[in-house]
Amino acid sequence: MNTKARALGMNDTRFLDPAGLNDNGQSTVQDLVKLVVYATRYKNIWQLLQEKEFTITSEDGAITHNIENTNQLLGVIPNISGGKTGYTDLALGTMILIVDIPGHRDTIISIILGSKDRFGDTRKLVDWITDAYHWE
């Protein structure tokens, strides 16, 4: 993961486990934006991040997992194209949210770190951006 991060230009990120739960791992907002831009290339995965619930089935059909998305903003903020939530006791709440701008090829990438109210803070930030800026 760290090799891939460097290849993406994520020079201030250090992964210590795939889940990101090790408190000694670190990243920056700038590096997370690079990761989000890269991840959006994988539409089949990104599409799942828009769903409140979905089922994943093994290739042989023997195992299924029902997944509930923890993103409480799905269906609340319009035009969400994906997002990722996170929480650890040390990092507190984290949230990455990608919102498409209707009629334009632009997107808002909102990243909240160290929050006690990641969903509320994300909503405030996205609302402020959509109120403060106008796309032509």
Regions found by a protein language model. Name each.
Residues 1-136:
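Penicillin-recognizing serine hydrolase domain
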